[in-house]
Amino acid sequence: MKFLIIQKIKREVPIEKWAKMLPLQFKYFENLEKEKTLEVYYHLIGQQGSMLIVNVDSDEKLSKIVGQDPMFFDSEREIYPLTTRQTHEKQIRELLQPEPAGF
């Protein structure tokens, strides 16, 4: 299952700490890319944050990815489950189908 993770560094994090932790986070993301867990990474310009799309098979794996991030305690994040347009369209079509008579 794919998840969108938007994470931003907390404003109160001292720049010195941020400067030390950022290379560790880059290395962490690089490893996730090699594992094919991290599909997409973008820096959020002007936001001191990033946007990731991860592909995992369990909530345990998602929790591990988030919890092992070197910037875990210094970031705030939002996590959203994703689905394809085709899956979404199929679900909507099923919802909009009229129920058979007699129900």
Residue positions per predicted region:
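Conserved, structured core segments of small domains
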Residues: 1-103
